[in-house]
């Protein structure tokens, strides 16, 4: 299921770096993580939905690229985000 506008606004408010921030890597990664988690739940019940699985793999790749960018740019922001989102256990 797609992410709702309220949930997206909530994620933006939680991860923004300044007042009018909507496109920082932190916000983009948080939104992608929420979408990935929702799609993961969908695929647990609909195992043969290969079209959605491809979309999931594209989202995971995009998130990986954004995480690599953030790690190269600022390691402390990267580590804070990883801990906040619960990634890389």
From Swiss-Prot:
Biological process according to GO: translation
Gene Ontology CC annotations of this record: cytosolic small ribosomal subunit
Keyword rRNA-binding: yes
Gene Ontology MF annotations: rRNA binding; structural constituent of ribosome
Keyword Membrane: no
InterPro entries per the UniProt record, alphabetical: Ribosomal_uS15 (IPR000589), Ribosomal_uS15_bac-type (IPR005290), uS15_NS1_RNA-bd_sf (IPR009068)
CDD domains in alphabetical order: Ribosomal_S15p_S13e
Alphabetically ordered keywords of this record: Ribonucleoprotein, Ribosomal protein, RNA-binding, rRNA-binding
Purpose: One of the primary rRNA binding proteins, it binds directly to 16S rRNA where it helps nucleate assembly of the platform of the 30S subunit by binding and bridging several RNA helices of the 16S rRNA.
Subunit structure: Part of the 30S ribosomal subunit. Forms a bridge to the 50S subunit in the 70S ribosome, contacting the 23S rRNA.
Entries under NCBIfam families matching the protein: S15_bact
Family listed: Belongs to the universal ribosomal protein uS15 family.
Protein name: Small ribosomal subunit protein uS15
